[in-house]
Amino acid sequence: MKRIILALALLSPALAGAQDLRHPWTLRECLDWALEHNLTVKQSELNVAQREIQLNTSENSWLPNVSGSVNESLSFGRGLTADNTYTSANTTSTGFSIGGGMNLFDGLATPNNIALSRLNLEAATADLERAKDDIRVAVARAYVQVLYDYEIVDVARKQIELDDAQVARLEALAATGKAAQAEVSQQKASRAQSGVTLVQAENNLRLALLDLGQLLEFSSSEGFSIERPTVQVEEILLDMPERIYADAVGVRPAVRAEEIRLKGTDKSLKIAQAAQYPSLNLSGGVGSNYYTTSNAAYPQDTFWNQLSHNFSPYIGVSMNIPIFTRFQTRNNIRSARLNQELQQIQLDKAKQSLYKEIQQAWSNAVAAEAKYRSSSEAATAAEDAFRLTQAKYENGKATITEFNESRNQLLKTQSDRVQATYEYLFQSRLLDFYRGSALGL
């Protein structure tokens, strides 16, 4: 019984996950799940936690360090006694001490190191937000791809329904001698080709769901589906890339992280320069000893009396003045200045990359908008043309070849319209996302 209970306990997370997959997932659910389970995001979260520890360590560097020690020694033969004389005897010595030291001045290296640790934490937090943004975009893109493939499957199924109706119609006409058997066979061939198209569309849908499930770190995407919201394409007046970039550069975490790191290089330079200045340290402590000597010619003090008599506190201040460090300090300063220039280039590259991304998204949105308009017009025209061709075909005024050509053209224009719809929807939302808006449909 215990084994059964244990097995059920181990299986319960998997069963809970399977139950979660039984309902269609919304985009918000997918995004929330991905942010919680994505390994890259988890790695960035651990990096933030590590930086928090480093900041705490830096802040505590102002505190004094305190340590204690206990020693016990035993000497044989001629040795030094407690009264500072030498004699041939066995001598034991027990010592106790506690001491500490504190940094008073180190050329402002400590406050700059604390500031650097704080900036490193801010940069790590920005990196975490960047990782989250990357997974948000990837999940949204995959989600839209699934929606597109759903629509293509619907289009393919409608074509099969149309072909089935035509096959049934021709078979009925052929039975009465009003249609040739060749027409029936040709229509069945068209029906078979539509079946192949449907199989391909369904396979593409399964692959799209698999891709989305992998982004969500699902161990299995079996039974996984998404909610199909009502998509309404609105006419959006797109701002120019320059204006979008002006809004985005101040909020994008990728740029903000590099800006913070550039500030950090200034602190690193000051830390390197601090090695040019003298350092001042305070130290102090207390200690005591206890001695025993065999064959002593006089009575020895007790343990506690000796500790009291030998008690010796001390305090001191030391200054370390750098004179020649084999050019290490000079080279560290040079290296810190070079790191500043390198980080400035890294910041410029991040801004340049952001601008290119916005330009690409803007160009894609403009192209998708134009394609959506033209494909919508083409699909409407193809629907009208197909209705006319279908009516002619059913009245014997059009051939089956003309009918199938019109049907194939309708399928193509409908597919193009669906693709343009979701591409325009995603690219326009992506531009809003660059400006700081949440991703959504």
Feature roles, as predicted:
Residues 1-33, 202-243, 297-298, 432-441:
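Terminal intrinsically disordered/low-complexity segments used for targeting and assembly
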Residues 42-46, 59, 90, 104-132, ...:
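Sec/SRP-type N-terminal targeting helices
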Residues 134-247, 364, 368:
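Periplasmic alpha-helical coiled-coil/stalk elements that build and connect Gram-negative outer-membrane
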Residues 18-67, 71, 77, 220, ...:
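Bacterial Sec-pathway N-terminal export signals of envelope proteins
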Residues 19-23, 69-102, 228-237, 270, ...:
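Small/polar, glycine/serine/threonine/aspartate-rich low-complexity segments that form flexible
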Residues 19-145, 280, 284, 327-330:
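Short flexible linkers and secondary-structure junctions
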